[in-house]
Amino acid sequence: PAVVCVLLKRWFSQRVLYITKRYSYMSRTMSLAAFLLPTGHHAAAWRHAGSVKDAGVNFQHHAELAQTAERGLFDAVFIADFTSSIDEEGIEGFKRMTYASSFEPLTLISALSAVTQHIGVIGTVSTTYTVPYHLARQFLSLDQINGGRSGWNLVTTANVRESVHYGVPDHIRHADRYQRAREIADLVVTFWDVWADGAFVRVVESGVFFEPSLPRGAPPDGTFFAASCQ
């Protein structure tokens, strides 16, 4: 009987483990995001008879795509960014670039937030040509407006031709771009959470709206930025 009991325990334990693993596998979910490029992902898609030729600067077109994705139960729409004017093919290649005319991502996802209810909106912003405080403020503002539906696609800008648009004659080298990206990402997250939840007291009787003595901690200075909330 003791042997039978042990065998039953082993069988039962293995069975429970199998069922648990199977249930865990079956209950996993996949997140789906719609990658919206203005005129499609094929370079010549805009030439199709049924295409929207001015899709890059046609907000109604983007709104309909986002709303369709939302009805299809997608989790998010994703907006890439291109700021270089001429690629390696020179002016002849530029003539055929459909992304030469497109919305700035943060502006676009802010507008898409207003015409959707549940779907996430993800915008691309490079850390190479921006500053952490400004970036933190932009995304937190959008996150507050749309109820936590915004996302940030962090890139470091690989195209050397983009630097001139920001008044930088020489593109920052690869290692420095990634070090800067890590520093900015850390600072942005710190800025988002730098004040305690109770810091905004809003006491009508005393007239005190904000209590600055309740910080969670000032962000540290880095290699590229001397950040301070004091």
Task: State where each predicted segment sits.
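Short beta-strand segments at enzyme active-site cores
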Residues: 74-81, 121-122, 152-155
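Low-complexity, intrinsically disordered or signal/transmembrane-proximal segments
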Residues: 14, 18, 23-25
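Acidic-and-aromatic substrate-binding clefts and catalytic sites of carbohydrate-active enzymes
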Residues: 99-103, 128-133
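N-terminal beta1-alpha1-beta2 module of alpha/beta enzyme domains
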Residues: 23-116
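Internal, glycine-rich beta/alpha segment that forms the wall or movable "lid"
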Residues: 28, 131-230
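Active-site beta-loop-alpha junctions enriched in small/polar residues
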Residues: 37, 82, 126-128, 155-157
